[in-house]
Design a protein with these regions (language model features):
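Solvent-exposed interaction patches of small proteins and small membrane subunits
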Residues: 1-161
Length: 161
């Protein structure tokens, strides 16, 4: 489990562990059922799409925790899901540098859009190629988010010269 010494990061260890477990389960299922997904099997498409949805929720939960406990402000309202990504991609002067670089921000924005589709379309618009594309996108983005969080913790843990 990833552990942190700063109080502002204290909620993250169990959140990261939960998201990692979900991501590993998704990867294992996808390895076994990728051909079913590519063929358009409804059960496999639904299971894998929901897995991407759930892992993205875990990543968003981590970002919301950082917004609350490091930045001191959580976006609210109908655009909060995009706003949290915007906030994490921006430097907060005197508090922290940008957490998300442009490619990671774009990947998370795409995953957020896919999550919205899964959540609100009930599987009717799940196309096999989009599902595979988003599993692969998540496989790239997930470790980058965790690495960025660990990097930020290290940066904020280091006393200023």
């Amino acid at each position: 489990m990833t552990s942190f010494s700063l109080p502002a990061f204290s909620r993250l260890s169990p959140r990261i562990a939960r998201a990692e477990r979900e991501h590993h389960q998704l990867q294992a299922y996808f390895r076994l059922h990728r051909q079913d997904v590519e063929r358009g099997d409804w059960g496999a498409l639904s299971a894998v799409s929901l897995g991407v949805h759930n892992v993205y929720n875990g990543l968003e939960d981590i970002l919301i925790s950082l917004a609350r406990d490091v930045d001191g402000a959580i976006p609210l309202g109908p655009t909060m899901h995009q706003d949290i990504l915007d906030q994490m991609a921006a430097e907060i002067s005197g508090i922290r540098p940008a957490l998300l670089d442009e490619p990671l921000y774009e990947a998370l924005t795409e995953l957020k859009g896919f999550r919205h589709l899964v959540r609100h379309k009930y599987g009717f618009d799940l196309h096999p190629e989009r599902v595979v594309e988003n599993v692969l996108r998540l496989d790239g983005a997930f470790p980058q988010v965790i690495k960025a969080v660990v990097w930020l913790h290290g940066l904020l843990s280091t006393p200023a010269p």
